[in-house]
Amino acid sequence: MTEREALTALRGDDVAQAARAAGVLWQMWHRSGDPRLDGLLQEGIEAMQREDLPGADTTFTRLINEAPAFAEGWNKRATVRYMAQDYAAAIAECRETLARNPNHFGALSGQGLCHLMLGQFSEAADLFRRTLAVHPHLGSARDNLRTALSEIVKLN
C-alpha cells in the first residue's frame, strides 16, 4: 500500500481498513531511509517509554540535526515536550512536523491537545477538525473536538 492509498483508505467507510491504513502510515513515517537514523528514532522512543524525557529530547534533537527533513524526528520531540508539559515548544515542533508532512494526523491531533491544555479552545477545535479531515475515524480527535467545543460554549 502506498502512502496515497493509505491516506485514501483512512477516509473510507471501512473502519477496519482505516485502522490498517493508519498502521501502515505510522510504519512509513517511522522509516527515514537510513538504518542509523531509524536506530536513533528507536533509541529516543525507548527513552520516552522509560520516561527519560531529557534523554529522549537529546536523542530526537540529534536526529533532527542529522536529518532535518525527517518529519517523525520533529513529531517525536513534540511528544516529549508535550509529556514535559512544555506545550508552547510542543506546538512549535508539531508545526515543523506538519511543514514536512501536512497529513500527519498525529501531529495535528497533538498540536490540538497542546492548545487544549493551554485553554486555547478555538485553535484546538480547528486542529481537531483538520485531524478528522485526514483521519475521520480517529475517535480521540472526535472526543477532543467535543471537549474543545464544549469549552467554547462555556466561555460564551
Regions found by a protein language model. Give the residues of each.
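Register position in tetratricopeptide repeats
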Residues: Q49, M83, M117, S150-I152
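Alpha-solenoid helical repeat scaffolds
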Residues: L7, G23-W26, T61, R95, ...
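A conserved position within tetratricopeptide repeats
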Residues: L10-R11, W26-W29, I64, L98, ...
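TPR-adjacent "capping" and linker segments in tetratricopeptide-repeat scaffold/adaptor proteins
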Residues: M1, W26-G39, L155
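Terminal, low-structured helical/coil segments at or just beyond the last alpha-helical repeat
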Residues: A133-N156
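Residue-level signature of tetratricopeptide-repeat
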Residues: R77-A78, Q111, L145
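Alpha-helical adaptor scaffolds
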Residues: D34-G106
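TPR-repeat structural position
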Residues: V15-A18, L53, Y87, F121
